[in-house]
């Protein structure tokens, strides 16, 4: 189980990312349209003005039940060992164990 402070920090980053998403997207579109180098540098400066934690690269997908940041499956939103336990307990419909 991840510490609650780490989970809260991740939620705060998600809120910041949503807040500044439109600003980042619009300035990136401007960069592709502008041809002069000096104008591009000004727009790059605008991109650096939002807080660092608002960047989408700083977000991690976390397990829905444990908050574990590694080995997550996007389809289920669970980490690998929790997914395995739930499949063994037949709690996930349609998921089957592999056998060969």
Curated annotation (Swiss-Prot):
Name the GO terms of the biological process aspect: translation
Major localisation? plastid
Family matches, as SUPFAM superfamilies:
Glucocorticoid receptor-like (DNA-binding domain) (SSF57716)
One MF term in the entry's GO annotations: structural constituent of ribosome
List every stretch annotated Disordered: 1-23
Q: Name one Pfam family in it.
A: Ribosomal_S14
**One Gene Ontology CC term in the entry:** small ribosomal subunit
Which InterPro entries does the record cross-reference, listed alphabetically? Ribosomal_uS14 (IPR001209), Ribosomal_uS14_bac/plastid (IPR023036), Ribosomal_uS14_CS (IPR018271)
For this UniProt record, give its keywords in alphabetical order, as a comma-separated list. Chloroplast, Plastid, Ribonucleoprotein, Ribosomal protein, RNA-binding, rRNA-binding
Subcellular location, in the record's words? Plastid, Chloroplast
What role does it play?
Answer: Binds 16S rRNA, required for the assembly of 30S particles.
Q: PANTHER family recorded for this chain?
A: 30S RIBOSOMAL PROTEIN S14, SMALL RIBOSOMAL SUBUNIT PROTEIN US14M
Q: How does it assemble?
A: Part of the 30S ribosomal subunit.
Family, according to the entry, reads as follows:
Belongs to the universal ribosomal protein uS14 family.
Record-given protein name: Small ribosomal subunit protein uS14c
Q: Which organism is it from?
A: Panax ginseng (Korean ginseng)
């Amino acid at each position: 189980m991840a510490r609650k402070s780490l989970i809260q920090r991740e939620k705060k980053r998600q809120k910041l990312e949503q807040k500044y998403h439109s600003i980042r997207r619009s300035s990136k579109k401007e960069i592709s349209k502008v041809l002069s180098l000096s104008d591009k540098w000004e727009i790059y400066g605008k991109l650096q003005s939002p807080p660092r934690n608002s960047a989408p690269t700083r977000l991690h997908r976390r397990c829905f039940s444990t908050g574990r940041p590694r080995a997550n499956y996007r389809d289920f939103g669970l980490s690998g060992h929790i997914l395995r336990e739930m499949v063994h307990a037949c709690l996930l419909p349609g998921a089957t164990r592999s056998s060969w």
